[in-house]
Amino acid sequence: MGTQEGWCLLLCLALSGAAETKPHPAEGQWRAVDVVLDCFLAKDGAHRGALASSEDRARASLVLKQVPVLDDGSLEDFTDFQGGTLAQDDPPIIFEASVDLVQIPQAEALLHADCSGKEVTCEISRYFLQMTETTVKTAAWFMANMQVSGGGPSISLVMKTPRVTKNEALWHPTLNLPLSPQGTVRTAVEFQVMTQTQSLSFLLGSSASLDCGFSMAPGLDLISVEWRLQHKGRGQLVYSWTAGQGQAVRKGATLEPAQLGMARDASLTLPGLTIQDEGTYICQITTSLYRAQQIIQLNIQASPKVRLSLANEALLPTLICDIAGYYPLDVVVTWTREELGGSPAQVSGASFSSLRQSVAGTYSISSSLTAEPGSAGATYTCQVTHISLEEPLGASTQVVPPERRTALGVIFASSLFLLALMFLGLQRRQAPTGLGLLQAERWETTSCADTQSSHLHEDRTARVSQPS
């Protein structure tokens, strides 16, 4: 078993033992511990900017000395790194890195990665400065890139060796650098750039925040912050900040300048995400001496909408399942059939339409299936599985046999006929009543007119009979 595995086993035992024997305190305390990582050292001949191949790298270990981490009581039996514990027939190159000048906020993720079932990928390479030859000869610089698997953080460190002199007793044969009495290469971390997660997924139209933080040694000045997007072989500038001035190339992109100086936070916010925002984002921080970057993958997702319809009422009806508005492209469509009292069974034979893409970039497709209702009818379900869905999305419909459809048609037609008869009968019942009211009204009008005529005749008669 390797040294790093042994250290991890001891740490895991200490964590589990502490958890069983004593309760966790209500509030944790900070404790400085040594974080030991298995790494690879890229040889000087390796191509810069790319991961070195197995032939171009050597085994190495990185010891981050006395890193403050939050202790909940589980680190009581944890011991710091001892140089003699790594003595082997073929010992790795050991880099001791002091973190007194910077902060390592994700040190806990590095410390507990193995015990959490995650892996830490660590590669160390030479870091070259654009400086005078005299300055370069007095020291050496290295960059360590560490990534925690499973969506964990990613950290890049720039390490500087002490001033190189020829009076050192121990000397590394290949690095041409002095060694400590324990046989390690001593360095100090002067600059770090990190992100909390290396990959993010957001829904179409939502707002995304891409995390990017940094820490630098006293005496260094922040020169610029640059966010770039790489997608399908094309690169473009998204946001830049230089000398206190920010410029958003992508509409709506924001970076809080106040956070740069106070919290060393260079996170980028992107509102109203579109398909064009998907890709690999590069956060590059430049100081007066160093430059480092982090890479974040942004994935855009759109959930599908499912609609199931019956295309025709033929002897063997056709079902059409429309899946619309989803992204990315990969989608799985399954059909199931369930008879009354039975269990769902997957059916085959479905066909698919050509793929359609909207102006927004989302996809749509239709799946068709010839249904076999059987003697008692059956329920068909179209089920869609997509990365944007926590669980499959489905739509169901019941298909009845032809004879039941005929019976239902007869019942429906009979119902319409009865309703029509009832409506006509109701109209006929209301018609005489209305006619009687009209006749009564006419009779009253006639009677009133006759009465008035009679009174007028009597009045005229009376006037004629009076003597002159």
From Swiss-Prot:
Domain annotation Ig-like C1-type: ranges: 304-394
Consequence recorded when altering residue 226 to K: Loss of MR1 expression at the cell surface
Positions on the Lumenal side per record topology: 19-405
Membrane topology summary: Single-pass type I membrane protein
Species lineage: Eukaryota, Metazoa, Chordata, Craniata, Vertebrata
Disulfide bonds: 212-283, 321-382
Region feature (Disordered): 449-468
Boundaries of every Ig-like V-type domain copy: 181-297
Stated role: Component of the antigen processing and presentation pathway, which binds to MHC class I coupled with beta2-microglobulin/B2M. Association between TAPBPR and MHC class I occurs in the absence of a functional peptide-loading complex (PLC).
Protein name: Tapasin-related protein
A GO CC term attached to the entry: Golgi membrane
UniProt topological domain (Cytoplasmic) ranges: 427-468
